[in-house]
Amino acid sequence: MRPRSALRYSLLLLAFAASAAIQAQPKTLAVCTEAAPEGFDPARYTSGYTFDASAHPLYNALAAFAPGSATVIPALAESWDVSADGLVYTFRLRQGVKFHSTDYFKPSREFNADDVLFSFQRMLDPQHPAHDLSPSGYPYADAMQLRDIIERIEKIDEHQVRFVLKHPEAPFLADLAMPFGSILSAEYAGQLIARGKGDELNSKPIGTGPFVFTRYRKDAQVRYAANPDYWKGKPAIDHLVLAITLDPNVRVQRLRRNECQIALTPKPEDVAALRQDPQLTVLEEAAMITSHAAINTRHEPFDDPRVRRAIAMGFNKSSYLKIVFGDQARPAIGPYPPMLLGYDDSIRDWPYDPERAKALLKEAGVAPDTPLNLYISTGSGPGGNPARVAQLIQSDLAAIGIRVNIHQFEWGEMVKRTKAGEHDMMLYSWIGDNGDPDNFLTHNLGCASVESGENRARWCDKGFDEAIRKARMSNDESQRVALYKEAQRIFHEQMPWLPLAHPLMFDAQRKNVSGYRMSPMSARDFSRVKLD
């Protein structure tokens, strides 16, 4: 070979080797998230921040929602049958599904019916050995009164289970697709309980999902590795990092510097500038969200509906929407967004009328300068900057004689304090989990949810509760619509919440990211993401 040809050949070999080395480098997706997870057992929590770090990357449920929709599709159950009376659900389980293998657990078997029974019976049976591993109970199961819905769960064989209900439950399949229905390993839980380390079920998670838990640095980041045995196929990325970044400005800065490839929920006012950046893409979703302020109806004088209506009429919602969201949200009038079944568009919002609000407060015997303790979280989510929203409420209510004291806490601390009922008012954004109105109503406003602490308004109206109970049990859509409209009318008169907005949701990503899709239920799925 002549020297020049040999040199050219050597250069080609080096170029090929370099290209192969680049392709072989592990691909890591870093996502800047809004808050730290409270734990890693989805049945114990209700926060989307927690589900982003637990249910979605680590677990699967029997059913799932089709990407970008609320349509229920098979997951760990490959198919099911429902009896004509709506009382018996028979699930055929997917075979060949493996649980995660880690340094702290090596499964000896594949997913089967025992795991389904364990995952649900621990929530339903107070005598179950794993029941008390969650000191605060199981908020979804408790608020939805799952014990009053499910008569029993039967193992037919290794790959079939049967749920027998006490009465028909219209959203039951959609409920099972929610994060609280994530399936855990009965084998792993049994080993932990036997060693007296049951708490590790919440800190060292084992699931069947697309990513395997690696480690958590509290309030900083969560790390995962791609699951090589994932039943849908190994994800295209090798590692996933959730970088906890409370400040939305910092999330955007980190995205621009390529420290994160996806930044969740940038501020609505930043969206236009982000769209002008040639390195970035902005994703938008008309999500199922109601941002609101829950009013504690067990605290005087807020136990009087006249006072709650006065608060509604004393708040300039139009100004709030412009300041916080620009044109990126519509006003909320009721408890759930217009896209859901039975939304009553005939109900008109309470008008902004400070003078009428003052008259109502006087009629109710409320003294001028009455204090109201408003609890908010740090950071910023789909409901905008909590501190800014709180300041607007504070300013408007001061004009009608209510002195708002703002108390700001880290997310988990605020959740704990408001479950205990410390607050007079709490800022919150509820994102629908299953595309059914019941998810907004029973969980957040039902009487049973007062006891579980999930009903932050601590409001129990028997007429409202009966309407949503009947709607939940009916498979007649027209009947459900009528009942939900009745419930909305009661809500509007009683005003346990100050409904604020139905915001659009935004995420931003770098141009080299593909395969990420937002969900109307705000479920973040990174298993399909590719980095170019």
UniProtKB/Swiss-Prot annotation:
Keyword Ligase on entry: no
Superkingdom per UniProt: Bacteria
Pfam families, per database record: SBP_bac_5
Signal peptide boundaries: 1-24
GO CC terms, sorted: ATP-binding cassette (ABC) transporter complex; outer membrane-bounded periplasmic space
UniProt key word Ribosomal protein: no
Assembly with partners or alone: The complex is composed of two ATP-binding proteins (DppD and DppF), two transmembrane proteins (DppB and DppC) and a solute-binding protein (DppA2). Five orthologous SBPs (DppA1-A5) are present in P.aeruginosa, which increases the substrate specificity of the DppBCDF transporter.
Function: Part of the ABC transporter DppABCDF involved in the uptake of various di/tripeptides. Shows high flexibility on substrate recognition. Efficiently uses tripeptides.
Family label: Belongs to the bacterial solute-binding protein 5 family.
Name of the protein in question: Di/tripeptide-binding protein 2
Organism per entry: Pseudomonas aeruginosa (strain UCBPP-PA14)
Gene: dppA2
